[in-house]
């Protein structure tokens, strides 16, 4: 479908609207200074043409060279070489999807782009290099602009830009034609038919342009959306490669330097890659943040929160990125950009129908954007704003992509000496700190509290109770973990070769000083023990017994079980350090009384049991005196020190 100044009114006979031959006078004067403007803008310059005017039919060009002039270039290589008739057909196909059908197509394009996936956009990157030039072989080097009137508007093209301007507005033309028809009712002249035909042609052009441009806005929105998504895929792929390269240099550079060989990559490569990533992430972040504030007024906030929940957009983290100015590293800036990108795509998914007025506002969105206000706009205005925003984002992405492309030489493989025999040292495994689990649990609990506070609509009693319980649990958790000390169930390593343990006891026992019967190597050391006389006071006996239990000198030869060698908790040690000798003696007396107050067996029976406890080495074969036998778990087996002294004296 091509339109030329003469071809606009030329066509095939036999159609509905036919213009008869009339005089050419008065054809242009009636439109002077009118909204219709110059008749040449419509493609009308011959009023005496007797050829019939065809309505709603394709027109054929009169000039064969016009095929080359009106090749419509677009931003896609697949459209290059497409004539304007094919473009208009596609515009009407896209524009035919009105209302819900257009929104479904719009949302389907976003979802299938995989931009909302966890791993980002994985769609194949397009090989678009830029806007193709206007294919006009007749245009000389001095011609920078090409103007051609069509029934859908004035086509203005240059080497890089192509516009289709709307020249006739429907409402002004309709009002003007109504006034003209009223005056023509009072005029009885032969030229009235020419005027009526011209007015009908003007109304027809206004209707055609109004219909075409309303559909063209939808087509342009879909085209800009596709450009933006493809550009996102390209930029994310480049940024991912730069980020991987930066991580490689961060890991391999210390290993290379330890090998004694100088690195083969330039010294400023690491900082250059970091600067490129910071530049790209900051530039895109602030551009998208500006676009988000504009498009948020078109979205339904309830649907927006719903889509954010579906595609795992953490609103709390986004709130921190939007309202904090702390210094972020390269990885944090990239994560911030990814989160805001997913949020912007959720906004595009939640754009309302063009005939719907949103009356409810989400409390979460109001916390993110306190200045949010929903605006009611007509369909054309909404689409124009949306198309312009998508086009701006696509242009910004193209600029970032060009910058990253210009530094792609920094991504080449750099041979280092990490595989040499001097660099076979493996990195040490990272040791997990003992408090890592405690810190992780605390952060998870705090994150749960933060989510609850962020999504709460009012400060009610339930919310306060929830926060208080969580904080109380955290306080109790930290108090419990700080006072709890790990205790070893195994005996400590003993350096003395004469000290051995045999864990055969399951009841209450005490350390008992026992002599070695048949070991000659231990005989000189046994003479160092000074006998304790029975005439000593009870307090002295108890004090000696206490010292024998708590002494840790290496010169003593104490035979005990593994359970007795368990290290006492620090708080018990601190408690006993604060007590005097008299207080320790009193406490020991209380323990003895408590153990013997319930049952008091006959003296002879108790003495017999105590002697059996002390004579374990004879009953168990003695094992050269190096191993203790089983102890009784009875309370009557508490030793008496003067009997021990008597037994030791007899054996010497």
Swiss-Prot record:
Q: Which residues cross the membrane?
A: 195-212
Summary of the function given for this chain in its UniProt record: Required for peroxisome inheritance.
Q: Which organism is it from?
A: Eremothecium gossypii (strain ATCC 10895 / CBS 109.51 / FGSC 9923 / NRRL Y-1056)
Q: Which GO terms describe its biological process?
A: peroxisome inheritance
Q: What high-level taxonomic lineage is stated for the organism?
A: Eukaryota, Fungi, Dikarya, Ascomycota, Saccharomycotina
An annotated GO cellular component: peroxisomal membrane
Residue positions with a glycan: 269, 503, 549
**Keyword Transmembrane: yes or no?**
yes
Q: Which UniProt keywords apply?
A: Glycoprotein, Membrane, Peroxisome, Receptor, Transmembrane, Transmembrane helix
List the protein's name. Answer: Inheritance of peroxisomes protein 2
Which InterPro entries does the record match to this protein? INP2
- Which top-level group of life is the source organism from? Eukaryota
In the bilayer, the protein is annotated as: Single-pass membrane protein
Q: Where in the cell is it found?
A: Peroxisome membrane
Q: Which family, according to UniProt? A: Belongs to the INP2 family.
Underlying gene: INP2
Q: Does the keyword Flavoprotein apply?
A: no
